[in-house]
Amino acid sequence: MELTLDEVLYKGVEAHRIGEIEEADRFYTAILQAQPNHPDANHNMGILAVSVGKTQEALPFFKTALLANSSIVQFWLSYIDALIRLGRKADAQAVFDQARGKGVKGKAVDQMEQRLSELAANQQDPPSDQLQPVLNLYTQG
């Protein structure tokens, strides 16, 4: 008996849920071989990649998921989170702004906005009164 894509996706999600990463990867890969732009399989492959420390490799999966279905809030959040993890804060902010422009909203989106604001605040240069003593020490050798 051949499984439908939804059944294979369910099996992948279940394998992922119980920590069988290789099995989940196998199911998601099977879906993507049949339907390369499948939004859920792409998103879940991105989540798998992040979970094993391959965040850079997750980006194309998240982007494909978004292109296939930009109405799913979690797709946006996962993509933005991956960009933040990679230190690409400006890209994360740009994607967030794009999401807002498409009408994406909700509590999790508001929380992401707060997170991005905090990251931006932490990037600012320190006040000159804090910098001057360090500069003085540096110039003194």
PLM regions and their residue ranges:
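Canonical tetratricopeptide repeat
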Residues: 44, 78, 112-115
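Structural marker of alpha-solenoid helical repeat scaffolds
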Residues: 34, 68, 85, 101-102
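Register position in tetratricopeptide repeats
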Residues: 17-18, 51-52, 85, 118-119, ...
